[in-house]
Amino acid sequence: MTRTRPITRRSALAAALLFGAALAVPATAQQPNLSAATRTLYEAAKKEGELTWYVSHYNGETAEAIGRDFTRIYPGVKVNVVRATAQVVFQRLSQDLKAGAANADVLSSTDASHFAFLKEKKLLATYRPENADSVYPLYRNMDPDNQFHATHTALLVIIYRTDKVDEAAAPKSWQDLLDPRFKGKLAFGHPGYSGLVGAWAVSLDKKYGWTYFEKLKANQPQIGRSINDVKTMLDSGERGVGSDGDGYFRKKQHEGSPYRTVYPSDGSVVVLSGTGVMANSTKPNAARLFANFLISKEAQQGLVTRDWSPSLRPDVPGAPGAKTPDEVPTIRVGNDDMEALTKLRERWRDTFGS
């Protein structure tokens, strides 16, 4: 019989230190082995020289780092990063399109309804990245017609500060957040700005109905805009419990911050964030090369390294303690589910007054 060794504080710390040491290896400009197709695409991209990336599903620092990593591997092709929340990015793109301006070459968004709209209007290019079949099956074929692909995933969970909430009283489910003991302690982003928060709200509305949010209001949550505002509110100690992706807070816990991550018994929300190449791109080769890079081994390793983000690829191990959607109860958000987001935003404003 095989015995499983228990995970102790010492062994967990050792794993984290080993992981950190691995991440400390400096990046190099060495290219991976390029296929003939990718090399041909790269040669064409070098003639274009740059691309502009509209992106919502990373913070600004991470998005800029991804752009630098791409240029290190593909010298001569620069990435101009335009980063904002999902709805702000899409508003800017919509203004570009109305003005006939081809400013964005690549769009990455946490809101799948953006891609459904663009696809319907024939504003996305058809492109299947070479790396598309290298991701876990769960993340393949976000669009069967190859107009957008999953390039990032988030597992939305509950986080709490141990100096604000005792472990015995900590929430175990989304329903627990309705308990009066969390009044004045909760922090969330806003579905009118953040695609991730929108997906979370759509999921819980579908599961529990809008009465869930009406009850949640009674606990006086603090509502930011971006889901990243939850990090700010919890890091400052202003609030003690919130919902966000799990990676950032697991990393902070390993670094000594008073955080614990709860994978809700009624389901962590799995959100796929997509990427598409704009049909009117003036840098179509650079755009395709970059879209392929986002799901490369190098790019996915960079995300795990910097943010402890979930990996889309089986050949890129997750950070210490990372959970996959197969290991915990989940609520999975489909493209069709996100069509409900427009009406939900209005209900959210009516309920929470913002």
For the regions a protein language model found, what residue spans apply to each?
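N-terminal export leaders
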Residues: T8-L13, L17
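Extracellular/periplasmic bilobal clamshell ligand-binding domains
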Residues: P317-S354
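Short, polar/charged alpha-helical segment
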Residues: S35-T52, S56-K78, I158, K252
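A bilobed periplasmic-binding-protein/Venus flytrap-type ligand-binding module shared by bacterial periplasmic
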Residues: I159-K164, A201-V202, V271-A286, G302-L303
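Extracytoplasmic ligand-binding site segments that recognize negatively charged/polar headgroups
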Residues: Y54-G67, V79-L97, A102-E238
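Periplasmic-binding protein-like
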Residues: T153-L155, R181-G192, E214-K217, I223-G224, E255-S281, L294-G318, ...
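A ligand-binding cleft/hinge motif common to bilobed small-molecule-binding domains
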Residues: S113-F117, G240-P258, D307
